[in-house]
Amino acid sequence: MTIQHMEEVGYWHQAHSFVRGNWRNAEESSPMILQKCCHDMDIMLWLADSKCESLSSFGELSYFTEENAPEGAPAYCLDGCPHRDECAFYAPRFYLENLDGYLVCAVTDQTDPEHVLEALKKGPYGRCVFHCDNTVVDHQSVDIKFENQVTASFLMTAFTDQCARRIRLMGTKGEIKGDMDAGTIEIRDFVSGNLETIELHTPANGHNGSDMSMMHDFVRMVGEGRKGKTDAAVSVESHLMALAAEEAKITGQVVNLRGFANENK
């Protein structure tokens, strides 16, 4: 009957990709609710087993703005920032302490300390997070009504430690909780009171193995000439939901999805 779903972006992922990185500016890329959360819309569509009827949304870019820059903070971290010791986003520490991570590969293709530091001096990833040209939100919520009367509440926020998805499905006979980061699914039966925990053993990289799984499935479909479990129309529906959520955020109104789709053909 009800879905509660949260996209925990992670403070470090937000800073890297959506404040300093390629997806920081909605005019140059797309709204964050589309680029980061169309997958979440897809998950909720599949679980609700129904098309979206209408939705509302609220969100803001509240923290990563010029107004919140500490006094004396320069445009680039390496220009003598007086707040480097207490700033979670100080670029040299942010990237140099994670030279083996994938984030630093976006800074430069030569990931030794010398080249990373050089790239941070005047490159986009060396900018103060409060002095960037970012326009996408750092938190947004969406309330969804499906055609079969299932309702869903979705939250996307930058202000978390982990980058993860957590979901709760509330039904008439029990509830299910899913934790992508922990790799667990909990099933509670209302009648017996029994709790079943399922542990999922998935790879830590590539979106928990889903990137490779999609490619394997695509190759099999091409090689065997068969159809996939879903078609492009389902992906279009989830993208429409994300775009309609952005429209609802901007206008402050409840958006009917079919009407929105017809108006934007």
Label every model-predicted segment.
Residues 1-127, 252:
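Predominantly a Rossmann-like dinucleotide-binding segment in NAD(P)-dependent oxidoreductases
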Residues 20, 25, 35-36, 131-132, ...:
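Generic structural "secondary-structure junction" signal
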Residues 21, 26, 92-93, 97-98, ...:
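Generic signature of intrinsically disordered, low-complexity segments enriched in small/polar residues
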Residues 28-35, 129-130, 201-209:
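A short glycine-threonine-serine/GTX helix/turn-capping micro-motif
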Residues 59-63, 129-132, 157, 233:
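Short, solvent-exposed loop/turn elements at beta->coil junctions and helix N-caps
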Residues 136-265:
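C-terminal helical cap and adjacent loop that interface with cofactors, partners, or active-site loops
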